[in-house]
Amino acid sequence: MQNRTLPYFLILPSLLLAAVVIFWPVVHLFEIATHDVNRFGQLREFNDGANFTALFATAEFMNALWRTAVWTVAVVGGALVLSIPVAIILNMDFYGRSVARVIIMLPWAVSLTMTAIVWRWALNGESGMLNSALHGLGLIDTNIQWLASAATAFPMQILVGILVTVPFTTTIFLGGLSSIPDDLYEASSLEGASLWQQFREITFPLLKPFVNIAIVLNTIYVFNSFPIIWVMTQGGPANSTDILVTHLYKLAFRLGKLGEASAVSLIMLAILLVFTVIYIRISTRSEQS
């Protein structure tokens, strides 16, 4: 009996610490989200979920919710599509492979805020590097307002999001590729398998657990990503690039609606929890089958 209960006693301090660090803020958020709150965070009367009702009644929140889904799917999906071939190339034995790996990983080591500042400068409509390059190549005659136009601002931010997510995803896939025995490729080559057949029958099936890890971690990371959107456009022009996290920031620190901002936080937490649980169950069942 003592041997059975000992592990629980050993992890009890960590569980208590996790409860204080994680669950107490969530409980406090729920308390704020279900009460009227002034700008100074003072709770008033219980409002019976009026903050949630007010959110879903506004077009700004619904647009931010939809845009968050597009942002997350596009960035995570784009990063996966780019990272797999990059990881396969970097896993090959060629001269300068170590240097190439360092170059690919460098953007991951740079602050995301600084990266967003550099891209904001590069995409400047008047003196940005991208417009200058396109002018030099003779592809455009007039400057394009990349971040000042609703039609181009969000797609460019998605592109930047993909580029800054690729290094982390590539690192995960490199770890997966290094665990695949070379004997499998040698045996398939002797059987006359092409590179595409090797990828389809060997590489990708054995890489699936790492793909699942990348999807879950990147979804959480991208879903909550604040610097790229905020630094580049602050959700503009005219809230056309707002996602949930920037909409939350505006509600809390610009409009002083702390109750609605807390409600947004709880909705975001619920979305991530539901996604993570469902995806892990689906991936586990597919691996077992």
Curated annotation (Swiss-Prot):
Coiled coil: none annotated. One of its GO terms (cellular component) is plasma membrane. Keywords: Cell inner membrane, Cell membrane, Membrane, Transmembrane, Transmembrane helix, Transport. It is found in: Cell inner membrane. Residues 65-279 form the ABC transmembrane type-1 domain. It is a multi-pass membrane protein. InterPro entries: MetI-like, MetI-like_sf. GO terms for biological process: transmembrane transport. The chain crosses the membrane at residues 9-29, 70-90, 99-119, 144-166, 213-233, 260-280. It comes from the Bacteria. Pfam families: BPD_transp_1 (PF00528). The complex is composed of two ATP-binding proteins (BRA0745), two transmembrane proteins (BRA0749) and a solute-binding protein (BRA0748). Probably part of an ABC transporter complex. Probably responsible for the translocation of the substrate across the membrane. Belongs to the binding-protein-dependent transport system permease family. This is Probable ABC transporter permease protein BRA0749/BS1330_II0742. It comes from Brucella suis biovar 1 (strain 1330).
